């Protein structure tokens, strides 16, 4: 029986354990917003048609994309992959995301514009890859190499969103519908929400469900449940019923 030579090739390629997981010289201006906004996206990315164990969300994580240039990577501010195990090989937290090892490319990437990376994020740089041994730009990687279906940039200073959807002609403007950018594969949309997150009031990017309801964070769900319980307790008191007494009687019945 003949052996498939591709098996040896895959074994020879590095995995996430073999590749660097950080680069202190990576351009961009890390700031508090670059922590909070990706976190809110992560907490609200809850597709109904995928279980939590079939989703991986990365933030400021090395994304290795070329098996012929195994040291080349991009570092998206936020990206999501569906149809892949939450844990690497179903057992370990990821150090990086290595596309040739995982076998699945991201569904969507979000970049938060910074002065040092804005031109590259928006596809305004001239390098297209393999010029003088330089790696290709983010735009080239996302559009041509990985062919990521959805790409979105967000400027925290102007609150401007620039969104693109992959077509046969490459990335084309991705128009908002009902004040959001619909992602068919996960039956959710991205929208701009004005509110308070982590004590900060501003416009944030966050996910909405197919009924256009904002998907709540765990903290928001807990607060909503507390408010519901408080309203119920107040109503019971209006009817002359002590809600605390009900708890005591239930314990005595047990």
Locate the predicted segments by residue.
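C-terminal interaction segment
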Residues: 2-30, 35, 47, 65-70, ...
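Short Pro/Gly-enriched beta-strand edge/turn motifs at strand-loop
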Residues: 58-61, 91
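Acidic-basic catalytic patches of nuclease active cores, encompassing PD-(D/E)XK
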Residues: 31-59, 66-79
């Amino acid at each position: 029986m003949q052996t498939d030579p591709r098996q040896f090739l895959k074994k020879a390629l590095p995995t996430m354990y073999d590749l660097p997981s950080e680069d202190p010289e990576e351009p961009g201006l890390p700031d508090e917003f670059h922590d909070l906004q990706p976190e809110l996206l992560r907490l609200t990315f809850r597709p109904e048609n995928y279980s939590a164990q079939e989703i991986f969300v990365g933030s400021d994580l090395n994304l290795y994309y070329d098996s012929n240039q195994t040291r080349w990577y991009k570092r998206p501010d936020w990206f999501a992959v569906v149809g892949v195990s939450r844990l690497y090989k179903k057992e370990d937290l990821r150090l990086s995301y290595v596309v040739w090892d995982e076998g699945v490319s991201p569904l969507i990437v979000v970049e938060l514009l910074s002065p040092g990376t804005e031109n590259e994020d928006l596809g305004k740089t001239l390098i297209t890859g393999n010029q003088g041994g330089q790696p290709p730009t983010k735009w080239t990687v996302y559009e041509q190499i990985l062919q990521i279906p959805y790409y979105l940039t967000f400027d925290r200073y102007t609150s401007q969103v620039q969104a693109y959807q992959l077509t046969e002609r490459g990335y084309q403007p991705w128009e908002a519908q009902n004040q959001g950018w619909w992602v068919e594969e996960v039956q959710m949309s991205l929208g701009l929400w004005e509110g308070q997150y982590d004590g900060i009031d501003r416009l944030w990017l966050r996910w909405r469900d197919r009924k256009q309801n904002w998907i709540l964070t765990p903290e928001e769900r807990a607060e909503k449940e507390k408010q519901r319980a408080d309203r119920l307790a107040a109503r019971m008191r209006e009817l002359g019923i002590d809600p605390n007494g009900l708890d005591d009687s239930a314990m005595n019945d047990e």
